[in-house]
């Protein structure tokens, strides 16, 4: 019976993502934020449950990726699409379809992850959940500036950048703690501390800066490892 617990939690991730899809199409931003946050909790808990219960399975791995594709790939894409359709000039609304690149590259990222055993402790490219977190912050900024042309077009330009980051081979450190000791976890603790500060300062909009910081710290860590 216990072997089904991780997959059940993964299905809750998927369910939360499906609700977020409906809310995104309805323009309910805070509902989307709540559902994506809930999906992230379930995404963490299914892996934790699998480790504690020794309930790993090939099916669980594939199911987890399918759930992540919806919750962290499709949801931010629909949220961005809805906002771009609302705020772009009438003659430019077709540009909103660029948001659909997000789930395509998220699918490529997840497929790549599933066949690459070297990503157990570190990642290659931006994890799909991190992509979703970035877009939560970016969409909040977009809503706050609404008619600001600069923010609109920066959001559009950010799509191919984030898509590239998901599928590139840039080494990204994992946020999984082997222990709570400072040594060996310096970057993780630093990211957590700065993330809390950014959220207090900027609210949900700070999510974009947090993921930007994560990318920068990963680049610095990779360069340090080479030296």
Show where each model-derived region lies.
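Topogenic membrane-insertion module of multi-pass membrane proteins
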Residues: 1-47, 199, 221-227
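Multi-pass membrane catalytic core of lipid/isoprenoid biosynthesis enzymes
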Residues: 6-11, 52-111
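Hydrophobic alpha-helical transmembrane segments of polytopic
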Residues: 9, 32-39, 98-105, 131, ...
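Juxtamembrane membrane-interface segments at transmembrane alpha-helix termini
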Residues: 45-52, 108-114, 168-172, 219-227
């Amino acid at each position: 019976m216990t072997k089904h617990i991780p997959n059940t939690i993964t299905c809750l991730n998927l369910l939360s993502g499906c609700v977020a899809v409906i809310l995104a199409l309805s323009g309910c931003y805070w509902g989307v934020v709540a559902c994506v946050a809930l999906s992230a909790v379930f995404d963490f808990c299914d892996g934790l449950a699998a480790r504690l219960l020794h309930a790993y399975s090939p099916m669980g791995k594939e199911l987890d990726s399918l759930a992540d594709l919806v919750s962290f790939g499709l949801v931010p894409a629909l949220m961005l699409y809805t906002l771009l359709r609302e705020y772009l000039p009438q003659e430019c609304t077709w540009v909103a379809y660029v948001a659909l690149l997000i789930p395509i590259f998220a699918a490529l990222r997840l497929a790549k992850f599933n066949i690459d055993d070297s990503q157990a402790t570190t990642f290659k490219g931006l994890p799909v959940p991190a992509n979703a977190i970035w877009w939560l912050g970016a969409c909040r900024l977009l809503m706050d500036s609404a008619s600001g042309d600069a923010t609109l077009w920066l959001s559009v330009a950010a799509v191919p950048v984030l898509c590239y980051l998901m599928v590139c081979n840039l080494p990204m450190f994992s946020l999984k703690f082997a222990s709570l000791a400072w040594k060996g976890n310096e970057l993780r603790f630093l990211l957590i501390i700065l993330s809390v500060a950014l959220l207090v300062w900027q609210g949900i909009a700070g999510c974009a800066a947090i993921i930007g910081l994560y990318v920068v710290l990963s680049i610095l860590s990779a360069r340090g490892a080479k030296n």
